């Protein structure tokens, strides 16, 4: 019996201009890039994280970018916010000894979702390694792993010293109308949509608007 705690890693699926997520899903695997370029310093850095992954751990396919408009909260107009699009979830079954390949079981019908502020751009991001970000990491993992749509606690991040520069002080943080259409589309796919979130994050408002 393995008593080790399972860990959660966020991994990229784009190498250059090519996106391999559908290929990985079809093949039941995920791969770290830099094939035939193992001397690359970035590969060597990622290999250290790769070697931390074990059977039972969870991989989240992600892409990271910035957005200025069409956000689900009010912010200062001139600032761009870091966004992590979480696109898939897989459970690790086996790690091959080639330094690149992990055999996984991809979760079917995973609903893509966007997470803001606390994000990672590396090919392998292990937020649990950031010991002073335990609270943010726990929120992120709960958000990413949920079968249901959870509203991120935007107020928490907008009032956090690291991200409060984005807060528009003269306006109360609220869900934007143009973002509601994204949830309406999700609702069409998931008839058992349940909204969760901390008090004051807009669950009741959102439910009324997409009804």
Segments predicted by a language model, with ranges:
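P-loop (Walker A) phosphate-binding loop of NTP-binding proteins
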Residues: 198-199
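Conserved glycine(s) of the Walker
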Residues: 202-203
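Pre-Walker A adenine-sensing motif
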Residues: 171-192
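Hydrophobic positions on the alpha1 helix immediately C-terminal to the Walker A/P-loop
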Residues: 206, 210
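Compositionally biased, charged N-terminal/linker segments
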Residues: 1-55, 161-173
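Hydrophobic anchor at the beta1->P-loop junction of P-loop NTPases
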Residues: 195
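Aromatic- and Lys/Arg-enriched surface recognition patch
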Residues: 80-146
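Short, Lys/Arg- and Gly-enriched loop/turn segments at beta-strand edges
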Residues: 66-88
